[in-house]
């Protein structure tokens, strides 16, 4: 689920219009023909042979998003252990200035968790969450689609290419 700023000028104008249609006040699925513009890059980067199932949702807040990837043991062929997935992610992102793996939650904490989409708005931060059990895991990342998205990534990459600290202008 994403804020509407990533939808382009037309979507921004529709949602910010004082005369906007009632359906624009609630989350909306789009890209339902499985032809979203980011599918080719998702397939390539993930190494998938076939397009992934991608169900983007846009809501009426400006920026921020949560991206979730469900993984089922029966389909993946892997034995799922949330603790091992958590540890792997923590090792991978250890020392990262911008990506933070959140502590694994107990089943009771997972039941009580409400994962909002725009808590990291106006930042270049990303939080990764692991939910689930041995049968299925839900991997979620929360970020600002602008800050950690295209604009933040551009500044971070420019900093690295110029030999600057990657955090310049982003913290």
Q: What are the language-model segments listed below?
A:
Residues 125-171:
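NAD(P)-dependent Rossmann-like dehydrogenase/reductase catalytic/cofactor-binding core
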Residues 2-139:
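C-terminal substrate-binding/catalytic lobe of Rossmann-fold NAD(P)-dependent oxidoreductases
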Residues 1, 83, 167-171:
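Short alpha-helical "patches" and their helix-cap loops
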């Amino acid at each position: 689920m994403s804020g509407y700023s990533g939808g382009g000028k037309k979507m921004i104008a529709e949602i910010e219009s004082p005369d906007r249609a009632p359906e624009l006040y609630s989350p909306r699925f789009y890209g339902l023909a499985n032809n979203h513009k980011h599918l080719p890059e998702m397939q390539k980067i993930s190494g998938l042979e076939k397009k992934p199932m991608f169900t983007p949702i846009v809501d009426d807040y400006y920026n921020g998003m949560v991206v979730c990837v469900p993984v089922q043991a029966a389909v993946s062929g892997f034995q799922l252990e949330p603790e091992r997935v958590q540890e792997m992610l923590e090792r991978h992102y250890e020392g990262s200035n911008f990506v933070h793996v959140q502590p694994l939650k107990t089943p009771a904490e997972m039941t009580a968790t409400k994962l909002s989409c725009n808590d990291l708005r106006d930042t270049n931060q990303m939080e990764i969450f692991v939910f689930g059990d041995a049968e299925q895991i839900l991997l979620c990342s929360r970020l600002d689609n602008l800050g950690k998205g295209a604009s933040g990534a551009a500044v971070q990459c420019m900093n690295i290419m110029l030999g600057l600290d990657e955090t310049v202008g982003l913290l």
